[in-house]
């Protein structure tokens, strides 16, 4: 479904797949435009972005609240450390694959209905996990839990693509990622405290207690943003698309209903489940996803092994293990805000320098040349600090830098993907989820056997070198040929 036929809005949202070079006319508003690109005010955009950001918070929070209790679960369910890691692995597999279904559906039926459906699934899964004492059922319900929570990340990126233009998108992507990367900071602390005071079931009771009210909040306040349904946001909605308490978010100049907005239930439907996989057919996006996924997988080498390493090397209990995740999460929060501001600055600088147009792939990856080596150096240093049994402050510092530089890199790549697929940003972000979560699942599954065989130092050295080599190769190819590939696809 091509939104160019229905939204009536010029600019990049009118393209299902955007060219790599953005015309120089973006420097100034078009005087003949009678409708703004987005009818939502700046404050309203921030409200929408913060709402979907909170939705994206639950997925990483749900996985990280659980990690400090892994040694406890192994003891209570009489399983091995490798077996308990499987419950993390299946979560990440479902985290990667479920958006392939939900994101295309949100590109057809709208963001709001899919948000509500998936969070209801998440709530029910949390309730079931709260009473689970059987290993196989724990594995199954963890997959259901992930399938409900993880769609919010891809749909959230699509929502931001609905309401923002390229020149402002970097900052909003930073705000969007803020809550998403706060989950790794507070999740382990909450999980460690709950599992130490009671047991691992308490973490799922807690998730049930917070996901229920947020589901109600979305029913009350979340607005529809999909442009083929509401245009630039000024079209009136009804039924499932209308929040129970409808806030006044639009500019006064755009309050009138927009003609020509199609009901997605009318006509022939293309659910587009294949659409995320088509993203891999474009070389520039497949290379960006590969680089992103390598960083993500190597990051989970450190976070997935932290509970066992810090318990073995430093003798920490569940609560203190959870506290050790805080620096990484704080680094993630700092990184996402910084990356958003730097992205907008990079884009404006490229726009000012260009006489023909902005080369999007180069503009969005300018700072990535710095982030990637800094991240890999942090991973290398972290591994050898743990191997040498240094004071715990040293690996904690590198946990902070790992979180910061990885998040800055993720924000750059995510923004590039949204720019290249403005009409189908949710589906494109689902493709990113497939790559990152599948490689991350592999990392979680192999990290403990690797540490047992090679030691922490060489395990993280190998991870850092592979990430650096693959990432740099991908970036060089995108820098040299990205514009040509995107132009060829667009033509």
Curated annotation (Swiss-Prot):
Localisation: Cell membrane
Membrane-spanning residues: 47-67, 86-106, 119-139, 143-163, 174-194, 203-223, 287-307, 319-339, 366-386, 390-410, 438-458, 460-480
Domain of life per record: Eukaryota
Annotated segments matching region Disordered: 1-30
Main location: membrane
Membrane topology field: Multi-pass membrane protein
GO cellular component, one term: plasma membrane
Function: MFS transporter; part of the gene cluster that mediates the biosynthesis of itaconic acid and 2-hydroxyparaconate. Cis-aconitate is secreted by the mitochondrial tricarboxylate transporter MTT1. In the cytosol cis-aconitate is converted into trans-aconitate via isomerization by the aconitate-delta-isomerase ADI1. Decarboxylation of trans-aconitate by the trans-aconitate decarboxylase TAD1 then leads then to the production of itaconic acid.
Name listed for the protein in its UniProt record: Itaconate transport protein
């Amino acid at each position: 479904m091509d939104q160019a036929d229905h939204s009536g809005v010029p600019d990049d949202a009118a393209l299902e797949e955007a060219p790599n070079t953005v015309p120089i006319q973006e420097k100034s508003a078009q005087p003949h435009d009678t409708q703004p690109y987005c009818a939502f005010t700046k404050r309203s955009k921030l409200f929408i972005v913060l709402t979907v950001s909170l939705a994206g918070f639950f997925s990483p929070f749900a996985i990280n609240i659980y990690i400090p209790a892994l040694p406890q679960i192994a003891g209570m369910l009489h399983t091995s450390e490798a077996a308990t890691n499987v419950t993390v692995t299946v979560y990440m597999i479902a985290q990667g694959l479920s958006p392939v279904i939900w994101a295309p559906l949100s590109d057809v039926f709208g963001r709001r209905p899919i948000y509500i459906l998936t969070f209801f699934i998440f709530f029910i899964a949390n309730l079931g996990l709260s009473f689970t004492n059987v290993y196989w059922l724990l594995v199954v319900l963890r997959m259901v839990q992930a399938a409900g929570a993880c769609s919010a990340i891809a749909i959230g990126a699509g929502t931001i693509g609905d309401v923002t233009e390229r020149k402002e998108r970097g900052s909003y992507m930073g705000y969007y990622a803020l809550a998403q990367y706060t989950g790794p900071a507070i999740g382990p602390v909450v999980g460690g405290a709950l599992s130490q005071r009671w047991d691992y079931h308490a973490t799922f009771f807690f998730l049930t207690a917070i996901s229920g009210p947020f589901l109600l909040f979305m029913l009350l306040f979340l607005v529809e943003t999909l442009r083929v349904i509401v245009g630039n946001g000024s079209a009136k909605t009804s039924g499932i698309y209308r929040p129970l308490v409808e806030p006044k978010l639009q500019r006064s100049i755009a309050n009138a209903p927009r003609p020509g907005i199609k009901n997605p239930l009318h006509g022939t439907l293309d659910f587009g489940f294949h659409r995320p996989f088509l993203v891999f057919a474009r070389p520039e996006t497949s290379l960006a996803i590969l680089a992103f996924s390598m960083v993500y997988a190597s990051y989970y080498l450190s976070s997935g092994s932290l509970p066992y390493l810090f318990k073995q090397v430093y003798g920490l209990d569940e609560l203190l293990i959870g506290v050790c995740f805080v620096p990484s999460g704080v680094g993630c929060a700092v990184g996402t805000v910084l990356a958003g501001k730097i992205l907008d600055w990079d884009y404006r600088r490229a726009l000012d320098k260009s006489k023909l147009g902005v080369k999007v792939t180069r503009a969005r990856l300018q700072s990535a040349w710095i982030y990637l080596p800094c991240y890999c150096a942090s991973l290398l240093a972290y591994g050898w600090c743990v191997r040498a049994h240094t004071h715990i402050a040293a690996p904690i510092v590198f946990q902070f830098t790992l979180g910061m530089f990885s998040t800055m890199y993720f924000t750059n790549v995510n923004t590039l993907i949204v720019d290249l697929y403005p009409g189908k940003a949710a589906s494109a972000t689902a493709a990113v989820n497939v790559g990152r979560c599948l490689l991350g699942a592999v990392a979680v599954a192999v990290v403990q056997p690797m540490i047992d065989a090679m030691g922490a130092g060489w395990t993280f050295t190998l991870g850092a070198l592979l990430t650096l080599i693959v990432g740099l190769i991908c970036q060089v190819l995108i820098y040299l040929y990205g514009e040509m590939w995107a132009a060829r696809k667009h033509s």
